[in-house]
Structure formats: structure tokens, C-alpha cells
């Protein structure tokens, strides 16, 4: 299986993005299911995780069977949901343009997140989740403007 050779897998289910992770501990591997919004669910085996964790009332094992794993070149990775997941869960920096201006989302090791633009304006937030909830460009939320953005890197 994929997680035996890789440490994580990001997939899409019902337009939301999720991550399965394999982590080494003192007692062997632990497996985590990570959503953009909720606390991660962790179990001692992938089987336990798939049999005990639900997504909107559906067992994870059934979710995985219906999930899409887009190619990295697929434009779905530039959607608001994918970018928010990758920034929030994986700490990825995001570079995008909106109406001719360049913006980027960055993070510190301490967990703070920033939305900056090419005129040295910066909005600081205590977390990436807070950034995606409260950041504004021209008075609009990131979710509201995302359809007009061009993603350069995520």
C-alpha cells in the first residue's frame, strides 16, 4: 500500500481534502487521519483507523474507496479547499495573484501565519486556520475571491 512507502497521502472526498499519515513512534508506526478543521484522529494501525473513524457518518474505509487522489498536475490542487488544507495541515507556503497583485501565505515555526502582498502589506494571525477565516483582500475573504486568483505555488 501507498503508506508503506510514503509518510502521507492527501485525497479528496466530496470536495474536501484529507490526509492520512504514517508516523514512527517508540512503539512502531502510528496512523493519523487529518482534516482541515478538526483535531487529528490517531490509531495504532491503519486498519483500526479505517474501522473506527468516520467522515460525515461514513467509515473511513468506505470514504477511501470513494475518494479521488488527483495527480499533482491536476488543477484541483489550486482550489480554495485544497490550498487551505495544504497550508493548514502541511504548512505549505502559497503564492497567488489576484487582480494584478501578488500575494503569499507563509508560516513561522511558532505557528503564526501571514498574508503578505507585493506592496509589503502584511496581515498576521495566530494560526493558519485563523488566517483563512479572517484574512481580507479589499474587504473580501480569501474564499470569496479565490475563483479569481491564479495560484503560482502551493
Predicted regions mapped to residue ranges:
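Charged, amphipathic alpha-helical segments
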Residues: 1, 16-17, 73-82, 99
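Amphipathic, interaction-prone secondary-structure segments
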Residues: 3-34, 89-116
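Mixed-charge, Lys/Arg-enriched low-complexity segments
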Residues: 40-79, 124-154
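Short, Φ-rich (hydrophobic/aromatic) sequence segments
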Residues: 1-5, 84-88, 146
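Intrinsically disordered, low-complexity regulatory segments enriched in Ser/Thr/Pro
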Residues: 26-51, 110-129
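Mixed-charge, low-complexity intrinsically disordered regions
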Residues: 52, 80-89
Amino acid at each position: 500500500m501507498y503508506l508503506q512507502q510514503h509518510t502521507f497521502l492527501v485525497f479528496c472526498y466530496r470536495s474536501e481534502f484529507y490526509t492520512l499519515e504514517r508516523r514512527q513512534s517508540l512503539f512502531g508506526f502510528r496512523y493519523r487521519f487529518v482534516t482541515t478543521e478538526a483535531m487529528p484522529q490517531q490509531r495504532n494501525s491503519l486498519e483500526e483507523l479505517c474501522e473506527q473513524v468516520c467522515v460525515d457518518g461514513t467509515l473511513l474505509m468506505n470514504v477511501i474507496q470513494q475518494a479521488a487522489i488527483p495527480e499533482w498536475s491536476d488543477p484541483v490542487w489550486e482550489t480554495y479547499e485544497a490550498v487551505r488544507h495544504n497550508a493548514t495541515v502541511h504548512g505549505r507556503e502559497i503564492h497567488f495573484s489576484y487582480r494584478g497583485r501578488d500575494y503569499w501565505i507563509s508560516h513561522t515555526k511558532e505557528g503564526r501565519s501571514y498574508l503578505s502582498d507585493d506592496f509589503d502589506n502584511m496581515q498576521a494571525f495566530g494560526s493558519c486556520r485563523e488566517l483563512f477565516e479572517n484574512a481580507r483582500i479589499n474587504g473580501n475573504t480569501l474564499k470569496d475571491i479565490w475563483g479569481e486568483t491564479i495560484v503560482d505555488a502551493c
